[in-house]
Amino acid sequence: RRLRAALRANDIVVRLGGDEFAFILPRVRDEVALRRLLERVAAAISEPVAVGGHEIVPASSFGVAVFPRDGTAPGTLLKNADIALYETKADNRGGYRLFEKGMRAAIERRQKLAGALRADLAARRLDIALQPQTRIADGAHAGFEALARWNHGGAPVPPPEFVRLAEETGMIVPLGERVLEMALAALRSMLDEGLRPVGISVNVAAAQLKLDGFPATVGALLKRHGVAPAMLEIEITENVLLDRDPGRIHRSLDALKGLGVRVALDDFGTGFASLTHLKRFPVDRLKIDRSFIRAIETDSDDAAISRAIVGLAHSLGLEVVAEGVETEGQLAFLRASGCDTAQGYLFGRPEPAGEAQARLRRARAAGLLPLEAA
């Protein structure tokens, strides 16, 4: 009813299934007129809906194919509009995209890449890299972050590309579990050598946290590898806290905390989460996003924001990690600001687990491993 009310009298709307609809919009003068029409439809869709005592605000995305430029047969036009819709959703900004010929090749590449990712996940061919973290006060080793890595066709696939692909195709859960298992195995290898890796951080997606059995899976993996729960840190982004089912996210995080696992909030300051989330959710550490660190020596705003985050976190009893630290000047600023831990190319790039283990041997020889057992 909302869609029909927003459209013109001669426009046609058909439900394709689920939450997808097709529109036939005759006699649209130009793209300006099209944009106005789609904005009117989007506004109608986004009117709040009361569901189970909660107010839901629906969002919308559009893909557009133009007759006869993008095809003359109905099936071709529908397919090309669907391709444009996929591109709109991939942008994560809503709105609309007009079909372009290059989109078809991009979709075909993405489909092939998705098939290869699924096969490599099943064959356990993905790997991890470990990036060291350093205690700012004394330069001691402070742990690692585990990062997913994938080589396809003899070349590395950029992590943002294949992680987003995994999210779009429902493979983020097995990908996340694979990374977690490899991270704990690497930690176990270091412990078996008598090294003190301190701990390891692993990124976790909302889809994983919403699985009822996720905390139990984490507990089973910790037990299998003989790793103390306190050595594992789960990293989540601010957007995870804004999920449509925050209650389930909260319960999962509480269960992980009950196991003794630590929780870090990644990319702090770049999302839309409010400060109330720091009170509601069981967080141990904040990670200052690299975008604030990059110019802290020259940009007074970035410097002020970074100092404020450190002060806020410490007032709440939270530790702070600065990401993307690349220069001695940045490190000096963070030290003066009271930041606890640093991570970035100044201390080491992400490296294979074996090389990370060798790094720990060198740190032990230099007296840069903490004395307390972790």
Where are these regions (language model features)?
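HATPase_c (GHKL) ATP-binding subdomain of two-component histidine kinases
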Residues: 23, 58-60, 148
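Conserved helix-loop-beta segment at the catalytic/binding core of cyclic-nucleotide signaling proteins
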Residues: 1-31, 54, 261-265, 318, ...
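Cyclic nucleotide signaling catalytic output domains
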Residues: 13, 40, 44-50, 54-55, ...
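EAL-family c-di-GMP phosphodiesterase catalytic domain
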Residues: 25-29, 68-70, 136, 140, ...
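Nucleotide second-messenger and two-component phosphorelay signaling modules
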Residues: 1-12, 49-54, 91, 123, ...
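Bacterial c-di-GMP phosphodiesterase EAL domain
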Residues: 101-227, 239-241, 255, 268-270, ...
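Heptad-repeat coiled-coil signal-transmission/dimerization helices
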Residues: 3, 34, 38, 78, ...
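Alpha-helical scaffold elements within enzyme catalytic domains, especially in hydrolases
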Residues: 40, 87, 189, 255, ...
